[in-house]
Amino acid sequence: RFKKIRRLGALPGLTSKRPRSGSDLQNPLRSGKKSQYRIRLEEKQKLRFHYGLTERQLLRYVHIARKAKGSTGQVLLQLLEMRLDNILFRLGMASTIPGARQLVNHRHILVNGRIVDIPSYRCKPRDIITTKDKQRSKALIQNFIASSPHEELPNHLTIDSFQYKGLVNQIIDSKWIGLKIN
């Protein structure tokens, strides 16, 4: 994980740690002009590792984004940001996207009152995301909310941290996407 962060830069969905800036990163073999292929490959890898996607999943999202109206890049980022695992991460209910995936896979999360165990579930506006009524589920989310630094919540989400409930208000605005993509 840390090799990926050193190579690609900060990936907030993968871990909260940042790459060190200093002489240990100044590898003379990596300096020089980057080719267009290398730039595109690095940006694709950033997307894959940040959102925890396989190559096939990313290609499927690109195919959907190309069919949709508007800028393919913006539509792709909107599709990725509206995934359930990413919304849990943005709400602060999980410290990382892999942690959010685990919460969903272990059936701790309800969407509109129904258990959803698919991390790639595409949330829609007015979806209500809650935890199960079980004590263990609530304790997990409570620990994440208490330990996470309270960052500014995106406009498209609202959270009620006392009831462990999140609401998707609208489709995400492009300025709230936390990943710097070229």
Curated annotation (Swiss-Prot):
What does the UniProt keyword field contain? Chloroplast, Plastid, Ribonucleoprotein, Ribosomal protein, RNA-binding, rRNA-binding
Q: Where in the cell is it found?
A: Plastid, Chloroplast
GO CC terms, sorted: chloroplast; small ribosomal subunit
Q: Where is this region: Disordered?
A: 13-34
Q: Name one GO biological process term.
A: ribosomal small subunit biogenesis
Q: Name one GO molecular function term.
A: structural constituent of ribosome
Domain (S4 RNA-binding) spans: 82-143
Signal peptide start and end residues: none
InterPro entries recorded: Ribosomal_uS4 (IPR022801), Ribosomal_uS4_bac-type (IPR005709), Ribosomal_uS4_CS (IPR018079), Ribosomal_uS4_N (IPR001912), S4_RNA-bd (IPR002942), S4_RNA-bd_sf (IPR036986)
**Pfam families membership:** Ribosomal_S4 (PF00163), S4 (PF01479)
Purpose of the protein: One of the primary rRNA binding proteins, it binds directly to 16S rRNA where it nucleates assembly of the body of the 30S subunit. With S5 and S12 plays an important role in translational accuracy.
**Subunit structure and binding partners:** Part of the 30S ribosomal subunit. Contacts protein S5. The interaction surface between S4 and S5 is involved in control of translational fidelity.
Q: Give the record's family classification.
A: Belongs to the universal ribosomal protein uS4 family.
What protein name does the entry list?
Answer: Small ribosomal subunit protein uS4c
Provide the species name. Nerine bowdenii
Write the gene name: rps4
